[in-house]
Every structure is written in C-alpha cells, then in structure tokens.
C-alpha cells in the first residue's frame, strides 16, 4: 500500500489564478493628432458622415465579483497508473451537506452501495457515505451524535457525508476529501498531533 503526502506533487496543483492583462500605449506627439491645417479644414467641409457615435460613452462597468465558494479536491480510492492521486476538482457554495455537493458534482460516494435500497438516502442510519477528511476540517461542522455512534471504530477524521455541513454561504477555502476510504489503495501522511473534536470535548 502506497503512502501519499498531502503536499505531494499530485495535490500541489492549485486552481488556475485569474490573470488580468493591461497594455498602455504612449503617444510620441499627441498634439499632432489635433493639428489641422487650413487645407484639412476645407476638406472636412465636403465630408458627410454616414454613421454617428455618441460623443462620450459611459465607462464599462466592472465585472461583478464571483460569489464566495469552497473549493474541493476529491481523491479517488484508486491511484492513477503512475502512482499519483486521481484528483477531481470541484467548486460549490458553502452551507450545504457534503453528500449533496458530491452527488450534484457527479463524485462517487457510495461505491458498491449506490444501488437503490442499498443506502438510507441521507438519513444517517446506514453509514455507507463515509469519507475521509484530509484537509479543511475547520470548514466543517463537528461530528454529530449519529457519527460518533456509527464511526466509533473508525479513524477520527472519517465522516458521514450526509451528516457533514460545509461552512456557511459566505465560506471560502479548500477541502480535500478521500472518497471511499474503506477501499483506498494508499494512506495519507497526516500529522498525529492535530486535535480532533472528540479530544476537545473531553478536555473541556
């Protein structure tokens, strides 16, 4: 079983930035464009306009800013032939269930339990929508009581997608999700000293 670094080459690829290019030209002799000789003035009297343009046009309105959204990196359970993670990038608004985001984005969630009547359709009783949170835990709600019961024998960073809320409508950030963690062919090198929600609750 291979080991995947969170900062490895397969996941370092970030979303392409938005580039804006501007080019300014400088007139060497700006006054020459406004200079008119008598000969030119006479010629302009014989010229008839066939189309007109408004003397002044309002400045172009700035493009509206994109609404806040959360970026997702969904990592498939099977690596690519070259051994790198098979990552699928998605973007969605916060304030939604992780299950809804994955299904709406055509991300595999249930694996062999995707057939009708093979899962509870998001109620939280079957525990077949398990995912592993690799990064971005701070954008998610704490584990629910249902998760604590259903996942008590699973690693602390495993969640049920149907019980996981992703931030608020104005949230931004990156969440890295391991799909189908029970069938993954690799392991994540995640620091062990990161506190989890259960530890924080027991210490208070």
Swiss-Prot record:
Domain (2Fe-2S ferredoxin-type): residue spans on this chain: 76-180
Transit peptide: 1-48
Keyword Iron: yes
GO molecular function: 2 iron, 2 sulfur cluster binding; metal ion binding
Ligand binding ([2Fe-2S] cluster): 120, 126, 129, 162
Entry-linked InterPro entries: 2Fe-2S_ferredoxin-like_sf, 2Fe-2S_ferredoxin-type, Adrenodoxin-like, Beta-grasp_dom_sf
Biological processes per GO annotation: P450-containing electron transport chain; photosynthetic electron transport in photosystem I
One Pfam family matching this protein: Fer2
Keywords associated with the record: 2Fe-2S, Chloroplast, Iron, Iron-sulfur, Membrane, Metal-binding, Plastid, Thylakoid, Transit peptide, Transport
Disruption phenotype: Malfunction of the NDH complex.
Region entry Disordered, spans: 1-24, 45-68
Subcellular location: Plastid, Chloroplast thylakoid membrane
Main subcellular localisation: plastid
Keyword match Chloroplast: yes
Gene Ontology cellular-component terms listed: chloroplast thylakoid membrane; cytosol; NAD(P)H dehydrogenase complex (plastoquinone)
Function: NDH shuttles electrons from NAD(P)H:plastoquinone, via FMN and iron-sulfur (Fe-S) centers, to quinones in the photosynthetic chain and possibly in a chloroplast respiratory chain. The immediate electron acceptor for the enzyme in this species is believed to be plastoquinone. Couples the redox reaction to proton translocation, and thus conserves the redox energy in a proton gradient.
PANTHER family: FERREDOXIN/ADRENODOXIN, PHOTOSYNTHETIC NDH SUBUNIT OF SUBCOMPLEX B 3, CHLOROPLASTIC
Description of how the protein assembles with itself and partners: Part of the chloroplast NDH complex, composed of a mixture of chloroplast and nucleus encoded subunits. Component of the NDH subcomplex B, at least composed of PnsB1, PnsB2, PnsB3, PnsB4 and PnsB5.
Name of the featured protein: Photosynthetic NDH subunit of subcomplex B 3, chloroplastic
Gene coding for it: PNSB3
